[in-house]
Swiss-Prot record:
Matching PROSITE patterns: PDGF_1 (PS00249), PDGF_2 (PS50278)
Protein name (record): Placenta growth factor
GO biological process, one term: cellular response to hormone stimulus
Signal sequence, renumbered to the chain: 1-23
Claim: Zinc-finger is one of the keywords in the record: no
CDD domains: PDGF (cd00135)
Organism: Rattus norvegicus (Rat)
Quaternary structure note: Antiparallel homodimer; disulfide-linked. Also found as heterodimer with VEGFA/VEGF.
Gene designation: Pgf
Annotated localization: Secreted
Compositional bias per record (Basic residues), positions renumbered to this chain: 137-148
């Protein structure tokens, strides 16, 4: 199910890029000369920053999975990009909420209504060090700490 959603979003992005590139080709001159994108522009486009990304509504609002939404995904700004060092990754420093009007369709498909849904967008991004431990490893460590804090009764020495 998730793979199908991702594939659908991928196709939508691909279609958008195809339309954009066709317009760019027809707007340019008919010469066979290729334009070279300068390094500074390449770096600026690929460096850690908020970028638009299609996100599934059901992933952002998991308590609403019993309904169908149209559109099923929305365009949100998310931190993405390269940091120039393998020890760093792109993370959000500041977020902001955005409210969008979405068509909400119940399972029986009637009556559907327009609803306002709030989503979180990344506004400011920064390259930060990657933490070595994963969330699962931190949970295991926390569980062990809790166990060791519980008082243990000792048997009296006779």
């Amino acid at each position: 199910m998730l793979a199908m959603k991702l594939f659908t979003c991928f196709l939508q992005v691909l279609a958008g890029l195809a339309v954009h590139s066709q317009g760019a080709l027809s707007a340019g001159n008919n010469s066979t000369e290729m334009e070279v994108v300068p390094f500074n522009e390449v770096w600026g486009r690929s460096y850690c920053r908020p970028m638009e990304k299609l996100v599934y509504i059901a992933d952002e609002h998991p308590n609403e999975v019993s309904h169908i939404f149209s559109p099923s995904c929305v365009l949100l700004s998310r931190c993405s990009g390269c940091c120039g060092d393998e020890g760093l990754h792109c993370v959000a420093l500041k977020t902001a909420n955005i409210t969008m009007q979405i068509l909400k369709i119940p399972p029986n498909r009637d009556p559907h209504s327009y609803v306002e849904m709030t989503f979180s967008q990344d506004v400011l991004c920064e390259c930060r060090p990657i933490l070595e431990t994963t969330k699962a490893e931190r949970r295991k460590t926390k569980g062990k700490r809790k166990q060791s804090k519980t008082p243990q009764t000792e048997e009296p020495h006779l």
